[in-house]
C-alpha cells in the first residue's frame, strides 16, 4: 500500500509517531514470515480476526491487503461467511458491508 492510500488517521499516527508505527509494521512482517502460510491466507485469517472483534478499520485494511495478495472477492466474502456460526449473522453482515465498501460495490 502506498503512502497516499493510507487512511487519514493512520497517516497522522505514522507522521507523528513514526517509531511506533515502524515497530508495529516490523512486528506484522515478522509474524507473517514466522510460519508456512502464504500472504493471501495470512491476510484472510487477519480479516476474520478483525471481523470477530468488529474492527471496521482493520476489516477495510485486511480486505485491501488480501486483494493485493491475490484473493478474489468471493474468497474474501467466503472467509466472512465462515464466521457466521462463531460470531453471529449480525456481526458477519456488518463485516461483509465493510468489505462491500472497500470493493467499491457500496458506491452509488
Please give the residue ranges for each predicted region.
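Mid-chain, well-packed structural core segment of small domains
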Residues: 52-81
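Acidic, glycine/proline-rich low-complexity segments that act as flexible tails and inter-domain linkers
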Residues: 1-42, 68, 94-108
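Aromatic- and histidine-enriched alpha-helix N-cap/loop-to-helix transition segments
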Residues: 39-40, 74, 87
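Residues at alpha-helix boundaries and the short loops/turns that link adjacent helices
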Residues: 34, 70, 86-89
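C-terminal structural segments of small proteins and small subunits
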Residues: 77-102
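Alpha-helix boundary/capping and short turn/kink residues
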Residues: 18, 57, 72, 89-92
